[in-house]
Amino acid sequence: LGSTLIALIHNGECFQWDADAANATSTRATIITGAPTASRDMLVSTPDRHLVFFGTETTIGNKATQDDMFIRFSSQENINDYTPTAENSAGTQRLAAGSRIMGATLGRNAIYIWSDTSLFTMRFVGTPFTFAFEQVGTNCGLIGMNAAVEVDGAAYWMSDNGFFRYTGKLESMDCLVEDYVYDDLNTTSNQLIYCGINNLFGEITWFYPTSTSNVNTRSVTYSYLDSTAKRPIWFTNASTLFPRTTWEDSAVFGLPHATKYNASDDTSFDVTGNTEGTTIYFEHETGVNQQEAGTTAVAIPANITSGDYDITQKVVRGAATNMADLRGDGENIM
């Protein structure tokens, strides 16, 4: 929010850190005065500049009143004022469809809010209501709080029952590797699933834990630039060199940046955190190898896995290959 960094502990307090304050680098973040003390998610609505809490308290400061479907937003440009009055723009809203809010993402024209069953939009409309809420999808809930992104006015997300897109209408996305993903997915660790955009190549990737892992070990990618309605392009990556826990697109740093969790204990320095292990920070699309500190540069292997197909079967022109009808005699070399 401007030069103020805001961070939320899931189901906990919200903190602020002012980068412009004197001795800022030696000053700890502080709990935001007047803000809810227990919330599932949080973001800043732009350009109207309201701080919004999702799955939060009906009575501010009383954690026992946390309602997983309740939304509370501050007055405009005042992150300390959350009590609605005739003089401010603070307010509240409770969503009806679902049992808990799973996550929210800022979009081009609205904030997208997902419960465990449904999709809602939250649009700034000004006085007297400040925001308008609309349910725009059912049976399409979000699988984890970081499993959705918005790109070019469209929202993409991973649900418990497939992949979805919203472009003004709800669409279930055809995914050629859906069984491969969902048949080996740790749904208990669903909050680890992380979705990131690589706009340099027009790709959306979901990093997820397999059924035998408690950390992200595999990914599935959708090419939103090259896909068509009849020819969606998906690919997976199970390389041990490419698990990622978070991802930030090149729009922020010029190149994609990501992190990886290494569960092995590094005895060269003290580790402070919830579990033993280290997090490694990567800048992507730099060079051709993966380089970790203290290790040898390694190229991430490329491979293609295909399945059986019958070249004698007629296909609609362009539907399967984006090429002409390929029936006829000849050699098929793999």
Please state what every model-predicted region is.
Residues 2-30:
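Hydrophobic or amphipathic alpha-helical targeting/insertion segments
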Residues 22-194, 229-240:
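Beta-propeller and closely related beta-pinwheel folds
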Residues 15, 61, 266:
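Glycine/Thr-rich phosphate-binding loops of Rossmann-like dinucleotide-binding domains
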Residues 1, 99, 137-154, 160-334:
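Beta-sheet repeat architectures centered on beta-propellers
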Residues 8-11, 55-56, 208-210, 260-261:
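Structural motif
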Residues 5-6, 52, 205:
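Conserved beta-strand elements of the Class I
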